[in-house]
């Protein structure tokens, strides 16, 4: 809660709860159901999102809806045609399966998640990540794996269109380990784009300065991570990086000195 207070004091408009809100510990290979973790939120995540709104900000959460971990209980029970399949076996990368958005049951699953986080959890912003490589496609209901991939991608875009029709005020950020999926098939739908997961402000400057060659500045989200300690130029450098696009304010704001907070 102190970090929420500090973000509000800085003038942030959105406050996003990052990865991990759905699990008490390690979660990489078990994601896929996206239910609030009561060990992390004994009073429910709505208690926190309500507090965020009370502080004048719109709450958000991190999701990676296009995948299910190989140890996700729902994935174990789902039929193979929920996922990309090649040579008769589910395709997995980095311990995750790729969902096939041509399947109506998959659409029903992801819509349930979106409806729940918006209507029950009170979320108005989604950081939609994507951290796998689906490969050349799927052989399910296709004459070639490439056809399966293309039809899946078109179905995914159609699903996004439907989400924004149902929730026109919802903001969804396009993210893929940062900026690895920066294209305007997606960005003609998505609200904004993560430009990088780079955490070193000295390395981020070149990324921020060149992001406009791939994405409009008003969609280019750039991180600022002011550190707890250091000279004031570090804070200024962080903030100037982010001011080239959409400021994604991060860092331990509640633990900054008064001088460093004033610079932010």
Features from the language model and the residues they span:
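Aromatic-lined carbohydrate-binding/catalytic grooves of carbohydrate-active enzymes
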Residues: 1-112, 125, 142
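Active-site and adjacent substrate-binding regions of carbohydrate-active enzymes
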Residues: 2, 23, 37, 50-54, ...
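Generic domain-boundary/flexible-linker signal
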Residues: 26, 70-72, 137-139, 183, ...
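Short secondary-structure transition/capping segments
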Residues: 26-28, 59-69, 105-117, 171-178, ...
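Hydrophobic alpha-helical scaffolding
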Residues: 38, 100-104, 146-153, 225-232, ...
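Short acidic-hydrophobic sequence patches enriched in Asp/Glu that either
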Residues: 40, 44, 152-155, 263
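Active-site-proximal substrate-binding groove within the catalytic cores of carbohydrate-active enzymes
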Residues: 156-264
């Amino acid at each position: 809660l102190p970090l929420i207070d500090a973000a509000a004091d800085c003038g942030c408009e959105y406050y996003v709860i990052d990865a991990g809100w759905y699990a008490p510990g390690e979660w990489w290979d078990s994601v896929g159901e996206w239910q609030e973790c009561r060990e992390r939120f004994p009073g429910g995540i709505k208690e926190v999102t309500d507090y965020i709104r009370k502080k004048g900000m719109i709450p958000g959460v991190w999701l990676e809806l296009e995948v299910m971990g190989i140890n996700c209980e729902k994935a174990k029970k789902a039929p193979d045609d929920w996922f990309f399949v090649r040579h008769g076996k589910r395709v997995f990368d980095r311990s995750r399966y790729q969902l096939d958005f041509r399947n109506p049951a998959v659409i029903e699953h992801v819509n349930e998640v979106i409806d729940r986080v918006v209507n029950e959890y009170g979320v108005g912003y989604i950081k939609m990540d994507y951290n796998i490589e689906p490969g050349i496609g799927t052989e399910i209901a296709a004459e070639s794996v490439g056809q399966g991939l293309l039809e899946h991608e078109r179905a995914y875009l159609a699903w996004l269109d439907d989400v924004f029709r149902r929730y026109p005020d919802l903001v969804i950020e396009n993210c893929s380990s940062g900026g690895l999926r920066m294209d305007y098939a997606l960005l003609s739908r998505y609200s904004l784009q993560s430009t990088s997961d780079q955490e070193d402000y000295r390395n981020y400057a070149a990324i921020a300065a060149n992001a406009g060659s791939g994405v409009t500045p008003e969609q280019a989200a750039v991180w600022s991570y002011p550190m707890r300690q250091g000279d004031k130029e570090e804070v200024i450098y962080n903030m100037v990086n982010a001011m080239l696009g959409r400021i994604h304010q991060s860092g331990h704001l509640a633990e900054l000195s008064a001088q460093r907070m004033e610079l932010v």
